[in-house]
Amino acid sequence: MEGPRSDVGRWGRSPWQPTTPSPEPEPEPEPDRSSRSRRGGGRSFWARCCGCCSCGNRADDDWGPEPSGSRSRGTSSRGGGSRGGDSRGRDSRGGRRPESRGSGVNAAGDGTIREGMLVVNGVDLLCSRSDQNRREHHTDEFEYDELILRRGQPFHIILFLNREYESSDRIALELLIGNNPEVGKGTHVIIPVGKGGSGGWKAQVTKTNGHNLTLRVHTSPNAIIGKFQFTVRTRSEAGEFQLPFDPRNEIYILFNPWCPEDIVYVDHEDWRQEYVLNESGRIYYGTEAQIGERTWNYGQFDHGVLDACLYILDRRGMPYGGRGDPVSVSRVVSAMVNSLDDNGVLIGNWTGDYSRGTNPSAWVGSVEILLSYLRTGYSVPYGQCWVFAGVTTTVLRCLGLATRTVTNFNSAHDTDTSLTMDIYFDENMKPLEHLNHDSVWNFHVWNDCWMKRPDLPSGFDGWQVVDATPQETSSGIFCCGPCSVESIKNGLVYMKYDTPFIFAEVNSDKVYWQRQDDGSFKIVYVEEKAIGTLIVTKAINSNMREDITHIYKHPEGSEAERKAVEKAAAHGSKPNVYATRDSAEDVAMQVEAQDAVMGQDLTVSVVLTNRGSSRRTVKLHLYLCVTYYTGVSGPTFKETKKEVVLAPGASDTVAMPVAYKEYKPHLVDQGAMLLNVSGHVKESGQVLAKQHTFRLRTPDLSLTLLGAAVVGQECEVQIVFKNPLPITLTNVVFRLEGSGLQRPKVLNVGDIGGNETVTLRQTFVPVRPGPRQLIASLDSPQLSQVHGVIQVDVAPSSGGRGFSEAVGDSRSGENIPMAFRGGA
């Protein structure tokens, strides 16, 4: 695509122009996925435990593309055997794994096993979903068979030895990550059994049973996150032994919000359940007065998603030594979820033409997007703010950070760091479009993640804003955050990262400037409550909406809020902006829009009230246009002029009826319209100015479960949709997705006639028990933003198995006939 500022519908400075087809996304270089060659050495046991000389494959990227439909997984080895059956020889993403390296090695490196040596025949990492480790680490929902741990928390393993363990024997566990593991960088961890390791790493023997040895291993709360290779070394009087690396024994380590020593620690269990473990959520959109909500499948535990999240860090080239720092990790994620600069996950598109990809409104979750990126290495078309935010929530929750998706209504986009939203008019109050670069988005979606901020002074821990939507550059790249919400609330815009930009999004003033006869500009009106009018997120343990505006800003109009705004503006590019303000206002104006469904007629109204003691005459001008949710509007398609006389204390209403046939030819994404109102009070010279955005609602999909849902057993869902428009919807596409229920599925259903009702039935096989969300969407060139969701309570299988290896069909582009078609 062209540079980001060329996107119609996104950048306020871009002129309105007809939609043109998007060019094919540029192909990206295929990532290097080759395994590194093995290194060896013949030095002493402890010398060979350092990163520069221990042998073995040190690569963290020994994987290939996942074959379509592949679900193979590795398992722990026991005496060289496999519990994985058909997973042997493949890595966790379905790609070919390197073979195990045969017998263990002795000090000479020749593979000779001498009598009396302590040989490790195998290791059981107790890594199945029902085992103690996965349950205690809250990773049992991951659809992986490898051991997945949260740092700073102990786990247990069993070593299978060739003889009984003796007090003179020495055992060391090793964890290695990256291409050149080094002890000093934390990428090569040595854990001597029975001795305290460095940085919180240690291991103790908890049980001996013949030749079996049970160990309790403690990981560091500051450990690097990622996928580690695991091996064991022993030393006895007869010699030294190293267990060969087995890819089935790879260990994933994640951040741990359950660990008080981890800087991502969250001291509320209900928060952890919601912001770390919940696999679905609500994302809010629309306008403050007409809030829409959509369910999003985060799917952070789906098979392949964890590998996709780690691949994002690899693709950025993030140094392994920095991967233990949540500040650095979240900042990299904010850069990599968008494709600009670094060929990240999603290509942004605000043009309205999505013919070469997927309409951002059609996505129902993150899984399809992340697995496509992992499988191909290419950026996925297309995303807008809620898609970037939904994927970011998935990535950060998957890696162990408590994260939520946040919507800010009337979100400012400050392009000149003035920390005000500036709108310029000529002498007749006609907008000067060539100067109006700032814009106000109807809504904007970003993320909050919870962590301490050791890089900032005290008092700035807690929620941090991370925004992956590419709007402005930070340190030369398109990323944003993490930024302390506390610094935003108090106008401390000098705190890193990107506080000025985010402050302007939530608490800047909307300043109207009028050109004077001498060419200078004067402030004629200030809207102090127009920006960041409502900030919301999904409530904990509920599908209700939670208002979190108060954590971002002091009460609107309060002394503390005004001080925060003026303090922030003093650090902006127009520090004296408030010095020229005039105030003489006794006529109030309020805009109201009828709540209407797309396809219906509607009415918008302006209510004027004279709060003074004298008669007032108001000349009013209303003009209506369609608008993208980013605040970029099209040409006016209807306008009204009227003069209103108001007695003291009186009110009057100016109404503008709008028929479907009037707005239909002009509609763009989100079905939003913008009413611009400007006016002038003859007697006092007061200037009236208001921009009011409203949207047309779209219908929902109705989902019904036909029968009970049981793990491993096929069940059926019925989807019903009624076309609200009198025109035919062409090339209609349904999407289905639900963690533990249905892998991402795309269904092509053809055309749907005007006002027609259609019924679609689909089968799926649940793979995990418990309450689940099955989410669907409908998209066509004529109608988008149509969604539906149903909760599915999945029972365990009759055999008592909590999980199933069955996988919902993930076919894409399947042509599906309708089960039933009916009239209006």
Swiss-Prot record:
The modification Phosphothreonine is found at residue 20. Keywords: Acyltransferase, Calcium, Keratinization, Lipoprotein, Membrane, Metal-binding, Palmitate, Phosphoprotein, Transferase. It is found in: Membrane. PROSITE patterns: TRANSGLUTAMINASES. The gene is Tgm1. GO terms for cellular component: adherens junction; membrane. Its EC number is 2.3.2.13. It comes from Rattus norvegicus (Rat). It is an enzyme of class 2 (transferase). This is Protein-glutamine gamma-glutamyltransferase K. PANTHER family: PROTEIN-GLUTAMINE GAMMA-GLUTAMYLTRANSFERASE, PROTEIN-GLUTAMINE GAMMA-GLUTAMYLTRANSFERASE K. Its cofactor is Ca(2+). Binds 1 Ca(2+) ion per subunit.
